[in-house]
């Protein structure tokens, strides 16, 4: 498959350079209206009543139509994603920072369990991890690493036997700066390759990964979650779960990436502008969103 050339736009940025004001309550792209107090509006136009989920060392969060309102901590997101059971954190700790996006709250419901996974390099899977990989039924692996990285720590044979392997390199590894996160976002060939997989029904379940499962995987996860309608706070909390695996994180850099997505008109507008077909976006949403049951 031929993809558009790689355009690494190093957008001039200081920590405050994106500058856009942000609504942290249900401001994703699912089309679900949100009241001024953050409550999701129901069909008759009135605001729904929030239901407390409890707080983790802070004031209580609430869930409305599947959404969490501030503050949202990684621990609260762990609780919200427990609906996916043992599949939330995967590979028995053999592959650090590997987890399902299933159960992540959306204004219209939640991310469907068992459809999209994110992780770090798979070289240490071993027999137990290969068993877990098989049990998850993963059909597609999107590798965001460069060819040199993949050659240094190749994925085990069991992954190639079970799943299609798609190389979608984002060539700026190991760098937590805002400018490099944004450059990852603008690696159009990589984003196009990833969404070519995510846009096919037969691709699911899908696993995408980089080396640490943090930076490049974090950018792609943020783009997917914003496209599905997750609020910025939920996206940030999902990203910060990386710290639970012992890896550092760069919240300012992901915030800058989210600002850049908004500057470009939102996740859907950005993806359409670089050539991702509308049908692929529709497939991703259909495969990955479990609506609230009335």
Where are the predicted features?
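Ser/Thr-rich, Pro/Gly/Ala-heavy low-complexity intrinsically disordered linkers and tails
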Residues: 15-79, 294
